[in-house]
Amino acid sequence: MQRRLTLICVLCVLFVPLAGYSAAAQPRPAGLPFQVYLPIVRGPPAPPNPFGFDLRTHINNAVIGYVTGANPKWTRAGDVLWSDIEPVRGGGYRWEVLAQVEANVRRLRSAGVEPTLVVQRSPAWAQRTPGRLCSPPKPEYVGDFVKFMAALAARYSSGDAAVHYWEIWNEPDFSPAEAPDVGGYGCWADSSLPYHGGAYYGEVLKRIYPAIKAADPNAVVLGGALYYFWPDDSVSRSFLDGILSTGAGNAMDALSFHAYGAWGASDLLVNKTLRLRAILNSRGLTNKPLFATEIAATCGFTAPCPPNFHQTQANYAARIYAEAAALGLQGAFWFTLAINDPGFQSSQLIDDDAGKLTPRPSYYAFLNSALLLQGTRYVGPPMKVLAADQLNQVQVLTFHKDRSSFPALNGAPVTLYVLWVPQIDFPQLYNLQVPPGAQAVCADELNLNPHDPDPLQQPHFYMCSDTNNDGMIPRAVNGLPKYVEVIQ
């Protein structure tokens, strides 16, 4: 009982609302109490926020409360299927097929989230690979695709359903033999073509890019959308080299790619980002922004998932956006926010059971970590692929934050540390080096619901200052990341 009372008192100190500051009312999940929750950010504009997710049209509006709760910047809001909109060449555009996508864009925009759309699937009359929706258009029909993209960008250049971010195809580095149409993959890869078809993709990109920009000067074109195979990236690398060999690096505003799960001691997001950056650097495109438009922890195609999968997924969710920020990604989208199980390899953060939405621990890990990371700038050493011997060692990411998330630290500038161990059976003791006597707040159990009526079932936030002035804050670190804010 004494521990329970102590924790409640600490929580009251840490989360007392700041008087005089209010926010516009936003939809929220039914049954959640109305309260001002961390972080409370004021002052200069926050640094770029890479956090986002995929949210499709069929999920009911109750999901919007979960969207606004995490304060994301981005969402992948659906697909534009050229094959459905122009089934007959020259027969006009059937924009009505986008009604549900438009409705999704509107509700996301009203929630303050920037939508992106994926353009894919060639009509039967335009397919380079006959009978395959994933096919690129034939050379003689690229002009039709250019006209379509110009009309599309113009249609959605303004209004309450405005879309400015366009991703061109989805995973085109798959070949037709590898990509069933029902999977939503592209299939531009062709070993008989230069650079496995990447040069052709680049030439198409060079033609549609100016048309999109002319139709909407605010448009942002995401090129690539690469699956980027790993560890054997020979085809994907050739495909990307082909894109860049045509000069199409200047016909996209950002390069997008997908990265799921871990590889060795590192997350594949780190491996792939560093590999892609090296390739871009070799082409003089050092500052080309990167978007990871699909990330997640999945349990693969085998069912059922392992018994501990939800905890493993939560561990990943609590660190992956810190890694995305440390990597300098423009965007990182979890695929997907909500769907019926198993969805895509059980990757979702929220289970949708006939309209009943049940957040997983990974959703709360996403929410709590994203809020703690709001307004941060990475100040640690450059990210690198971890060696195998780091698998059971504590990893630390360091961020600067102009204002603490916690009223207990009086909104002072802080250094935020994110600590975890990639794989470990027992917690690893780690002494975090801080200035002697530094004030600090520790955040643990980020996979818990911050709105749970029982404070013991909420994330744990408590003072963990260096009270003995030895310049160390001891932490027992395991797979679920711990966050520590230290006054500078």
Say what each PLM segment does.
Residues 223-230, 257-262, 279-315, 339-353:
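Active-site clefts of carbohydrate-active enzymes
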Residues 39, 43-80:
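Boundary/entry segment of secreted carbohydrate-active catalytic domains
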Residues 386-439:
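Carbohydrate-binding surface patches
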Residues 68-252, 256-262:
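Substrate-binding cleft and catalytic face of glycoside hydrolase catalytic domains
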Residues 433-455:
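Solvent-exposed beta-hairpin/edge-strand motifs
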Residues 454-488:
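C-terminal beta-strand-rich structural cap/linker in extracellular carbohydrate-active enzymes
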Residues 8-19:
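Bacterial N-terminal signal peptides
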Residues 300-377, 381-392:
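Aromatic/acidic polysaccharide-binding cleft in carbohydrate-active enzymes
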